[in-house]
A protein has these predicted regions:
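Glycine-rich beta->alpha junctions and the first turn(s) of the following alpha-helix
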Residues: 113, 124, 140, 160-163, ...
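Non-catalytic DNA-recognition/assembly elements of restriction-modification systems
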Residues: 1-35, 158, 162, 166-208
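Sequence-specific dsDNA recognition surfaces
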Residues: 19-43, 51, 55-82
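Hydrophobic/basic alpha-helical segments
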Residues: 123, 134-137, 174, 181
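A short beta-sheet element
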Residues: 54-55, 74-135, 142-147, 152-153
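Short, charged, low-complexity amphipathic alpha-helix
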Residues: 144-149, 154-174, 213-216
Length: 216
């Protein structure tokens, strides 16, 4: 074991920077200037081609903003497939989520960054690292702005991280993967039940659906 700013860690752990890890770090504005985004991205409050994933949606578990196919294609540098690590970098700085797998295409919203590790075994380690006390302290240490706290991708990429050797990382992944898969399954079931509720409730209120004969 060796003493570090994060406490004692195994000597086999490597000290690296986030930007040196084999992963994609991107955000909404990676797709173009603010003028280009305004001209090419249209948001909808009603159902459309793809979900526009925001920090507030990830917090609430409800996804109610959409983009059309043209906007989705324009935002190709921030496409989401599910399982990416998402971190809020404006306003509510440091909120960390795993992107859920939803029932249609998804694209990253504004004021958040997305991390997509090339190694699947890195995903949960990084998620837990950034939610952990010291990971959060590092993120809070790079935020600036008086009116609205924020941090940029460059500063984030320069943050230090201790990485286990590949063998230990793989063992860790095998232990936690079933746990996260169960969480994802439960979230999917909740999404399905919420959609069913939203579809049936208006019919019940209008009288189109009659449940008076159901024996409870």
């Amino acid at each position: 074991m060796v003493e570090t700013r994060f406490g004692k860690i195994p000597t086999s752990f490597k000290l690296m920077k986030n930007g040196e890890l084999p992963m994609v770090v991107t955000d909404y504005v990676a797709n173009g200037s603010f003028a280009a985004l305004k001209a090419n991205v249209k948001l909808y409050q009603e159902d459309n081609y793809a979900y526009f994933i925001r920090n507030t949606d990830l917090k609430s578990g409800t996804f109610e903003v959409f983009v059309d196919k043209q906007s989705y294609d324009f935002l190709s540098k921030s496409t989401l497939y599910g399982g990416e690590i998402i971190i809020s970098n404006v306003g509510d700085v440091g909120s960390v989520f795993l992107c859920p797998k939803l029932n249609k295409p998804m694209t990253l919203g504004n004021n958040i960054i997305m991390l997509r590790p090339e190694q699947n075994s890195l995903k949960y380690y990084l998620y837990i690292w950034f939610k952990w006390l010291y990971g959060q302290a590092l993120i809070q240490g790079i935020k600036g702005g008086s009116a609205q706290p924020k941090f940029n991708k460059t500063d984030f990429k320069n943050l230090p991280i201790y990485l286990p050797d590949d063998n230990l990382l793989e063992k860790f992944h095998k232990i936690v993967d079933p746990m996260f898969e169960l969480i994802d399954k439960n979230n999917s079931e909740n999404q399905y039940l919420a959609a069913m509720r939203d579809a049936l409730l208006p019919k019940l209120m209008s009288g189109e659906l009659d449940v008076s004969d159901i024996d409870l």
